[in-house]
């Protein structure tokens, strides 16, 4: 019996959510451009769900927002939290109406593999630990990227980008002896350098998810 030419299966994907809090697109884009400048490769071609729950203006220019995001190589796949008027406008633009569901922590897959590196990760290098944790005995330099489907442990300074829970594991953590990162992300929730500085010093710490928000906890000496 020949294999069917297509199959329809259910799947879960982790998407970034862009919360729009102002109808002033110039102000929105100015802030977005500032964030993109800090981590351009992280957002390049990224699919986004746009949360419009703070927008009650029925004249909000959703088409303009879509075009502005596309010009920055960001892709709106749908909207959530919109009024009926904006939801109808979204449908004419070919955007899906996404209903937010309750997020529950998924247990890590078993068996869990661990990738161990005893070296510094330098600018321009990228390391990925698929289906497991990443342990680095060394520093992660500016411009370097370390990614893991599980947790990331860095026995040194984290100055580049670290993305844990890349496959959606919300129980993943990022631990480093010195938190000076350009970007940290767990299951799609991220902080840029400015966010990290607001919540942490340059000392050691553990970053994890608390609900849908990142938090950083000090490590015992």
From Swiss-Prot:
Q: Which domain of life is it from?
A: Bacteria
Keyword Ligase listed: no
Q: What does this protein do?
A: Cell division inhibitor that blocks the formation of polar Z ring septums. Rapidly oscillates between the poles of the cell to destabilize FtsZ filaments that have formed before they mature into polar Z rings. Prevents FtsZ polymerization.
Q: Which InterPro entries match?
A: CAP/MinC_C, MinC, MinC_C_sf, MinC_N, Septum_form_inhib_MinC_C
Q: How does it assemble?
A: Interacts with MinD and FtsZ.
Q: Which gene encodes it?
A: minC
Keywords of the record:
Cell cycle, Cell division, Septation
Q: Name one Pfam family in it.
A: MinC_N
**Classification via HAMAP family:** MinC
- Identify its protein family: Belongs to the MinC family.
Q: What is this protein called?
A: Probable septum site-determining protein MinC
**Source species:** Shewanella oneidensis (strain ATCC 700550 / JCM 31522 / CIP 106686 / LMG 19005 / NCIMB 14063 / MR-1)
Q: Which Gene3D superfamilies match?
A: 2.160.20.70, 3.30.70.260
